[in-house]
UniProtKB/Swiss-Prot annotation:
Organism the protein comes from: Agathobacter rectalis (strain ATCC 33656 / DSM 3377 / JCM 17463 / KCTC 5835 / VPI 0990)
EC number(s) given by UniProt: 2.1.2.9
Protein's name according to its UniProt entry: Methionyl-tRNA formyltransferase
GO cellular component terms given for this protein: cytosol
Substrates-to-products reaction catalysed: L-methionyl-tRNA(fMet) + (6R)-10-formyltetrahydrofolate = N-formyl-L-methionyl-tRNA(fMet) + (6S)-5,6,7,8-tetrahydrofolate + H(+)
GO molecular function, one term: methionyl-tRNA formyltransferase activity
Gene that this sequence comes from: fmt
Residues at which (6S)-5,6,7,8-tetrahydrofolate binds: S109, L110, L111, P112
Family: Belongs to the Fmt family.
Keyword terms: Protein biosynthesis, Transferase
Cross-referenced PROSITE patterns: GART (PS00373)
Amino acid sequence: MRVIFMGTPDFSVGTLEAIIEAGHEVALVVTQPDKPKGRGKTMQYTPVKECALSHGIEVFQPVKIRETANIEYLRKFNADIIIVVAFGQILSKSILDMPRYGCINVHASLLPKYRGAAPIQWAVINGDEFTGVTTMRMDEGVDTGDMIAKSTVRLAPDETGGSLFDKLSAEGAKLCVETMKMIEDGTAEYTPQNSEEATHTSMISKELGFIDWTKPAVEIERLIRGLNPWPSAYTHLNGKTFKVWSAKVIDGSDDYEPGCIYHIGKNDMYVQTGKGALSLVEVQLQGKKRMDTGSFLRGCHVEEGSFFTL
């Protein structure tokens, strides 16, 4: 099929590669505009743009895809299908209706659960046992279109937002190619979503990562994993930002208040929470590198009985 591909982050790259490898003709790649990054504010390509250019595919980077001139530009490519994977802009009805096979989206959840942004991180934060990817024919709503195919993934006990991102990116790429084959063969079935079962997720912000030590240890540990590698869970120690990259749930003690560092060993640091405690495994003090707790304690003195900021 002749394809227009729309996507922006690393998550989208695997699907673009899979479509190319499957022998489809990618006529155009649409991605978000380049953004300045780093201290030097150097303009950086999106991961999808880098992939497209490596394959010699034309790239289009509109600020607003819904503008009339941009819609007419897309129309010139006479695509059979538009594939959308984490593009980052809402498509107008005129774009949705443009290709004969419609616009197909790969969404990183088992719809109708987790419509919206950041479904990968929220699956970890909420302690889900399973999640997955869904392909759907897009309509004017946000992740409300008719479903075509699903693939389920089990979360590992130590699953992080980053590791689940990689799993679902690979699974989504595979499912997209399978979905395209069903559409081309005329065997695709379109199942409406049950809106009564729908749940919605919100964007992940840096502020979400601030650890509330009054919450149960189980919830905090899931937050730590879900926000690894971005934006990370953090607290404050002696006025400095202190990131927690990994921790284990342990039994706590009613003798200590939440946030109290009640035990410091050679390689251990135990923190009381609202229910249970956490043994910190990998940490990072402001201005320092990530390191295991033992390495941190050898280079930084922490008083037993001191507190992280609540």
